[in-house]
């Protein structure tokens, strides 16, 4: 059997090894039930306890106030691009979007199908290598909400400070960096995230939504795209991705054992610093991102040529450092170092980068 590799994929991504080992142990016979979670009714008392525990752990780890609901959904963040305007564009039929990368553009394109969209700020002219300044841009606009993407997976940028939005709900796609650093949930009207980066396996989407934003969908909104459907039914309106929720619960337990979000944030800063410190000194490998807005989770870098990039990737794979190829729209390489990536994985990558540079001076 092949030894486990260090998987730097942007998603689906690395999961904590203790979680995988527990899944392996419980896979065939969960908790003495004589069946697997994958076989179990989503309306059984066993699964009810799993989803309740997952919700409680998320509330505890993110310090989610009581006036917010935690919803377990499907369809990924991409379906949220449609659900959000269908539910929230209900007063002015207009929303504000900040463009900071490919995913925020896709969110905007879906919102344009529902109502009017105003681009409040954009870093597209800078090829999304930075985060635009928002001071004074979010004042008295008549908007139903403002949408941001807190971390840009493809481009490798993140917000250092969350923009202050007065009286307008702030909606955030946190798919890549939820639970990786501390956020004040009360600053947001809605937070959403696909699970397959920092929460668990693909198939699950989490929405954390202020209760007063639920129930405003147009009567033509499809039932399955209405937040109220899930709120009224404890997320159990139809069959959920039960296995993904179970694994996510185990990941949340693991995160709590690590010391919670504040502890993992410090570890994430240390891991990213290992990479950025090397890139800042390197004469061969460079980072295209504005240093003021560098992501802790997704770190793109490149060599001067496509030939060297391919050589780097091939030799990395031979060393058990895999899925480092950058997104096709950016090129080069990208190391995604989510919560579950151990420090030694990043250190091994940096050691290899140093050797590669020495070989190609």
From Swiss-Prot:
Keyword Lipid biosynthesis among UniProt keywords: no
Pathway: Amino-acid biosynthesis; L-serine biosynthesis; L-serine from 3-phospho-D-glycerate: step 2/3
Binding-site positions, pyridoxal 5'-phosphate: 77-78, 103, 153, 173, 196, 238-239
Enzyme type, top EC level: transferase
Record's GO cellular component terms: cytoplasm
Keywords (A to Z) from UniProt: Amino-acid biosynthesis, Aminotransferase, Cytoplasm, Pyridoxal phosphate, Serine biosynthesis, Transferase
Lineage: superkingdom: Bacteria
Cofactor note: Binds 1 pyridoxal phosphate per subunit.
Gene3D superfamilies found in the cross-reference section: Aspartate Aminotransferase, domain 1, Type I PLP-dependent aspartate aminotransferase-like (Major domain)
Catalytic activity: O-phospho-L-serine + 2-oxoglutarate = 3-phosphooxypyruvate + L-glutamate; 4-(phosphooxy)-L-threonine + 2-oxoglutarate = (R)-3-hydroxy-2-oxo-4-phosphooxybutanoate + L-glutamate
Compartments reported by the entry: Cytoplasm
Subunit relationships: Homodimer.
Protein name: Phosphoserine aminotransferase
Gene name tied to this protein: serC
